[in-house]
Each structure stands twice: as structure tokens, then as C-alpha cells.
Amino acid sequence: MESKPKEFKPTWNLQNGKMILPYVLLFAGIILTLSLGSFDAGERGVEYNFFGRLGYYISYGMFFMFGAASFLPGLFTIGLGSLRLVKEEFELTNRLFSIPVFLLCYTVTLQVTGHVSTIPFASQGGFVGQLLSSGLEFVFGSTGKILIHLVFYFYGLILLLNESPLHFIGRILGTAGAKYKEGFKSGFGKRGESLGSLFQSAVEKFQKKESVPPWISTNTNEKNSLNQSYSLSNPHTHSYERNLGNKQPSELQNTLHSTFGKEGKLSDFLSKVDTGPTVTSKNSRIRFQNHGAFSGNFEEQGKVFRFESVSSSLSEKIREEKNFQKTPSRWEILDFRTSSFSNIISEKEPSVTLVVPSESEIKKEWNQTNPILQSEEIPDKFLFEEKEKVEQTDSGLENECYEEESVDSEENLSEEETLSSETSTEKDISENFKTSTISNSKEVSPNHTSNSSIHSLEKSEEKLELGLPFPPTTLVPEVKSKRSIYHVPLKSLKTTTTKIQDPLFKIEADKVARKIEEIIRQYGYESQVVSMERGPIITRYELTPPLGVKLGRITSLSDELRLYLAVKNIRIVAPIPGKSTIGIEVPNSIREDVFLGDILHQNLSLRPKKDLSILIGKDISGKLVGIDLNKLPHLLVAGTTGSGKSVCLNSMISSLVVHLSPEEVRFIMIDPKMVELTLYEDIPHLLMPVITDPKKATRALAWAIQEMEARYHSVSKLKCRDFKTYNEKVEQGAHRDGYKKMPYIVIFIDELADLMMVSGKDLEDAITRITQKSRAVGIHLIMATQRPSVDVITGLIKANCPARMAFHVAQKTDSKIILDQNGAESLLGKGDFLYKSPTAADLIRIQSPYVSEEEIEKIVEEARKFGKPSYVDFNLDEETESSVVDEGDEELFEQAWEIVRTDRKASASYLQRRMRIGYNKAARLMELMEERGYVSPQIGSKGREILK
């Protein structure tokens, strides 16, 4: 009885490790490169990174250690892994050692060139680059540092070419002339001696030695007996092993025997090696220097020699490993009584039925709104999934059965189980739904539905909305996004690289401080500069006022100080809030640029989540200043032309676009000048196109009032006091009751004075209503004007906008209107402004960040990739006469028209006296008559003409 061969489980060996090495290199290189490429230093960097926390922290460490050179290892490993896959003989050992050499050299190169990265801590060569560069420069100097790291570049190149330095230099020198070129390629030495002559001299030296090296043991008798016993015991021995004993002497061996004879020790050794001698395991790893004497050949690169004969122990290992790699036999149980061979081979096209729910069942179950696809006849190939589930539950079959590669062996379920599953599913479907069958010849897509199903689904959605205890929570449409994550990279924003050196600043500041003390002393007041604070554009010098002298006397010296210091403007703060000193703000001789990119990069880790915080610039000490629209809640900006007012508005919009997605904030932009805010057209944050018509601006604000009322209704139903609490409750579970999360709405008005001239009272009423009530429902207003007069910034608007920004203005009266005090007239312009906070009594002097038009276009381009804007369903072009007079006032309008028609007097004051109503109501009625064409427009002091 034949015994079954014993099965061996495959074991791990070095050959498998070499085969998987290129895949490991490719995988590691791709992960490292993509992680570095998607790295974002912001607070949401883990979310934006392609490989989550692993990629984020690896990238963070690499950038910190090696700077911009961190991309080098990933690209190198991808290249080496690809070459190894294409060419199996490609050696990786020495080439992998070249990666750290190139990495360290590149960090020094970046440190020398002064490379600046968009990531703050990844500039130049990182920590390692700074350390190496400083050490090399300290030891060898700046020139020696450059030469030394170039030498290491050369060494890394040699390692990459997998050659020794001497061989590489010799090969390069050999190609210089035709005389040496052929000699190096064919193996000639310096004197033109061939390999055979060199070998002959080596053999002669070897024959002079009478003893064989002790690490070689050759016992031919034992070897022959072992080979014979092994071949008899194992009939499946490879033919290569069985023929080793009968192998004919090689050509090289015959030549050597004829030259040196067969009696010498060298000839005996060669014959034993050529026929496969047995080498002891103790010395089996020795590499012989005279490998050219053995039969074999060099590889293509000429560095590795392959022997033709193999030892018996090594050949046995190779044979056993090949047996291990055989796949074991797989078992499959087929029941030919219940399954036919034709059904297994032939695949029938399935017939698909579309199940449509009835209207009566939709009323009972709101959750079932999608049609269900069910097949009437389930072929065998659709039962594979059920078969796998049965096999997983049955532990006995799991240990014994294996899947076959062909389709014939993939049926394990019996016909009774198949029929029972089909009948059970058909019963469930027939009890709940009415089916409609589609023929097999028609292809049905998963998204295909009939007209009746669409109509029923629309009815179900309408009834679901009607079933809510309140009207829709918001009129804002949802954004149809193309991406799952909204992200605008900061690489497109410009950053400054030059900083004013501290020694130069100290010299300049000390000089100005001595001048200030001398000027004040000339007017009879002794004072001393005790401290100074340097900002981007100004430096504040703090003086101790003399005792018994009024502060007004020192503040009156502003013109004299400006004259003797030869500066444009000087601002005196007397006293500094919270201190017993006087502050004199003097412009710097070298003005430091403040870019939006610098501010956003510095504040990435400090910015809180999901709020309307905006960075508005740097104060006089160089610290970042930010505002939160939730706490303001509205902002009023004023300044003359060229003061930086519109640039500040653009920087605030860009900051919101970079940090917040359209699901978190939406914009309404009103730009009568038609040149500032039109850059943001078609971004997904917009609720309506950028408005340039002043008449449409009033209608847009009227829509905002409707949205405000709708939001108040839903917020009050959820028992919330503010908008942030409402959204938090919706996220926690209130969305199950029909509540929806709502985005913030920010309304930007670039030129308020032009709108007030056209719309006047209507616009003021709309702004007043929004500023009074919209804070609690997430609607905020930012208005800018270049003419801060009383007729533009009225008392109601000022009362509801406690937060204000004042850029450079022409007169002190304008500064008092916007800030309620002087100071804005002495500003420097170009982004220099005073900020009045609703929570602080003193003013803060801030330098606004600069953002160019090209940077805005890049930000807008990145934002547009998220999706197209979803505008509100609101027609801005339609007439609003129906909204001016409601149903209750229609009778009042008819009465007023009757008075005008009979008395032939068309004036608001006459209607006010006759109807005993207020002037606003009477003027509104006259405007409505003008819109309907009953009376003519009023031209100057001339009365209106009655047209009907």
C-alpha cells in the first residue's frame, strides 16, 4: 500500500525576502511622498493628510529634521524599487546606502542656498541641515564646507552606481583613450596582460606551496557514497543531481590538465570542485579569490560570478524548496444529483424586477423612499455570496474544503436551500410591495425609476415637510460639492523672508529717543524715554511726563516733533491706558511688509474651530490681532481712497474662504463700485451673484431679513439662545427631529455711501433690522465707506455697530464720527488703521495685511474646485411693490389715490394732513404711485404731475 507523501508547509527564506523587497520599497516610497505632499501644518492637518495620523506625524518629523530635502528618500525608494522590478539582477544593497548620503548632502545644499519653504519650520535644510552646515563651516570654513559636501555628493553617486571608488575612477580614465578603452572592457591590466597570463602566474605561485589550504576538505569517497545512497532513497531526485556524477570535464579543466598535469594538488582540487565536491558546512560560506578557475560565467555587470556546478547539499535545499512551493490539493464536494453540469457552465442573463412602493404604504413608512430591485429567477452565480456565508458558519467545512479556480466547483449549496431562500424572499416582497417586471432584453441601471415612483417620492418629501412642527429652518440651499473635504492650500499666498535686524533697530530707536527728549527739553519740559515698542510700521516711545505739567501742553507739540524728526505723521497717546506714561508713535524709516500669508501661517495652530475668527493684522508690538464676528457682531469700516480699506476687506474675505467651507459660512457681496468684490464670482460660498446694482442691494437685504425670521423660529423651537448652541444641538441629535444645521451668513458692503444716496431710507431700515436682531442667528454685516459723514453713518447704524475700523481720514470730524474721538487723521495710510473694540475702551493701532489680486485669484480658483455655487431661489430683478405695501395697506393705497385724483394734489405732506398718517407712510404711498405709473417723478422743487 502506497503511503501518501507528507505535506510540508511553506517556510520563509531569503529568496522570498528578495522577491518582496522591491514591493516594500515602492509601497514605502509612495506613502512617504504622498504624505509629504499632502502635509498641512494647520490644525486640520491630520484630516487633510492622505494617510491620516501616520502620514501627518511622519511628515512633521521629516520636515523638522531635513526640511525641504524630505522628499528625496521617497523619490529614491520609488526609483530603486521600480528598477528592481524591471531588472531582477539589479543590486540594491549599496544603492540603498546612497540615500542617506544624498539626503545629508542635500540638506547642506539647501542651507547654503537659503531655500525658503511655505511650511514655517521646514525652511532650508531643517534641524539636521543647520547642524551639519554650522559644523562644517566651523571646521573647514565656508569654502571648505561647499567642497566637502560636493565630495560626499560624488561618493553617493559612486554608491548609486554600485562600484568601488577606485574601479569607478579607473573606468573613467580608461575611456579617455582608445588604447585603454578596449583593455578595461575585456579584462586587460595595466601592461596589456590578459586574464589567462595573470591566472597562469597565479597558479605557478600556488603550485610552489606544498600544502592545501586548511579550510578546504575534499573526501571524494564519502561524497560518492552519499550521492549514491541519496539517489537510491529518493527516486524523485532532480535529473540535474543524478547526472552530476556523469558530467564531462569542462573545456577549462581539460586545458588546465593538459598544461599542469593530473598529479598536482591543484589539478586534484580542480577536478573535485568541477564535479561538485562536498564542502564542510563549517567553511561553506568562504568565497575563493581564484574564482576564475572554476567553470561558470560572469553576469552582465561583470561583478558577480555564477558557478555552473552546485554542491549536493545546496541542490538538495533547492529541490526541497521547490516541493514546498507546490500548492496543496483542494477538496470540493459536488452533489451531482441536485446540480446539473449544464447549469454550472451556462450563465443565464438575470431578469430584474423593479419594486415600487404604493402611496398608502408611503404614508405609513416614511423611511422607505428608495425602490428595491429583486430578481424573479436567481441564477447560480448570484448565490455565491450566500454560499460563502454558509461556509463561514460551518466550522467543519471551513477546515476541510477549499475553493476551486474553475466555475464548476463553486456550488456548495443544495437545491433545497436555494429554493427555500427564494420562496422566503418572494413572500416578504409580496406582502409589502407591488412589483413590476422589466424584460430581460432591457438594461436597467440602479438609478432608474419610473414616473410613478418619482411622483410618489416627491409627495412623500412634501408630506414630511408638512409634518414638521415649524416651517423650513433655512432658505439657504445646500452646496453640491465635488470633494469630500474642503481645503485651500496656503502655498499660493506670498510670505516675507526679509526681517529688519535688531542691532539696526536699536541704533535707530536710540537716536530717535534722544531727539525726542531734546526737542521737549527745548520747550521747557524735562522728560525721559523709559521704553519703546517696535511694530511693523511704527515705534512707540514711552515718556514719563514732568510733574505739575498738563498733558495738553505736551500733546500740543505734535507738529514740532513732526518737524524736527522729519516724519510724515506723529500720533501722541496721552496717557497710555493702564500706564503712567505718554506714548509718541513715530513711523519707522524702513517699513516692514505684512502679508496675509505670514499671518495665516503663524496662526494655523492657534485658530479655533468652526467660528468666524478673522485675523486683521499686527499691532504696534508685532503681535497678531484677531476678531470674532460672533462677539462683535457687526463691523463698520471707514477710510479715504488709498488708505487700504478695500484691501483690508479682501484680506478678511480671503481669510474666511481659506479657513471655512461653504457648509460653514455663506456670503452676500454688494459692490456698487463693480471692481473690488467681483473677483469672488462663482465661489461656492456665495448665496447670490455679486450685486452691483444699488436697487438690487435693498432686495438682497430684504431676503436676509426673511432668512433671519425663519432662523429665529427654528432656534426658538429648539430652546437655544445663540446660533452656535443651535448647531451643536443639531450635531448631537436634533437633526433626527427635522432640524438642519445652518451656515453663518456674512454680508459684505463695499461702498455704503453710494447705496445710501440711491436707496436712502429703505436701505437704512433694512440695515437697522439686520444689525439689531441677526446676531443670535448667525447673520453678520461688514460695511465699508470712504465718506464717514452723518448722512451715511447714521445714529442707528453707529448704535448697532460698536466694532469699527478707521483708516486714514481727511479731517478730525470724520475721525470723531467713526471713532467718537480724534486720531484717524494722523494715520499713515496703506493699511494703517485704528480699531475700536466693543469690549475695550482704548483704541488699538494695527497694520492690515496685504493680499494681491493674483493671490485672490489663486484662492478663488482653489475654492471653485470644491463645487459650483448654489444660489437662493430669489429673483433680484422683479419689482418689490407687493413687498412695499402688504394686504393691509392696499386699502390705504386706494384711499390715498382717490384723494390725489379728486384734489389734484400729489405730495406726501398733503396725504399726511388729509389721512392723518406719518410722513414715512405718506412718502411710501407716493413712491408706490410713482412705481405704478399714477404720478410722475418729482424733479427738484417742481410738484408731481398726475398721469391718470
From Swiss-Prot:
Keywords: ATP-binding, Cell cycle, Cell division, Cell inner membrane, Cell membrane, Chromosome partition, DNA-binding, Membrane, Nucleotide-binding, Transmembrane, Transmembrane helix
Domain of life: Bacteria
Cytoplasmic compartment residues: 159-948
Cell compartments where the protein resides: Cell inner membrane
Entry-linked InterPro entries: AAA+_ATPase, FtsK/SpoIIIE/SftA, FtsK_4TM, FtsK_alpha, FtsK_dom, Ftsk_gamma, P-loop_NTPase, WH-like_DNA-bd_sf
Transmembrane helix listed as a keyword: yes
FtsK domain boundaries: 622-816
Record-linked PANTHER family: DNA TRANSLOCASE FTSK (PTHR22683:SF41), SPORULATION PROTEIN RELATED (PTHR22683)
Domain notes: Consists of an N-terminal domain, which is sufficient for the localization to the septal ring and is required for cell division, followed by a linker domain, and a C-terminal domain, which forms the translocation motor involved in chromosome segregation. The C-terminal domain can be further subdivided into alpha, beta and gamma subdomains. The alpha and beta subdomains form the DNA pump, and the gamma subdomain is a regulatory subdomain.
Entry's family note: Belongs to the FtsK/SpoIIIE/SftA family.
Oligomeric and partner information: Homohexamer. Forms a ring that surrounds DNA.
Task of the protein: Essential cell division protein that coordinates cell division and chromosome segregation. The N-terminus is involved in assembly of the cell-division machinery. The C-terminus functions as a DNA motor that moves dsDNA in an ATP-dependent manner towards the dif recombination site, which is located within the replication terminus region. Required for activation of the Xer recombinase, allowing activation of chromosome unlinking by recombination.
Name of this chain's protein: DNA translocase FtsK
Species: Leptospira interrogans serogroup Icterohaemorrhagiae serovar Lai (strain 56601)
Gene that produces this protein: ftsK
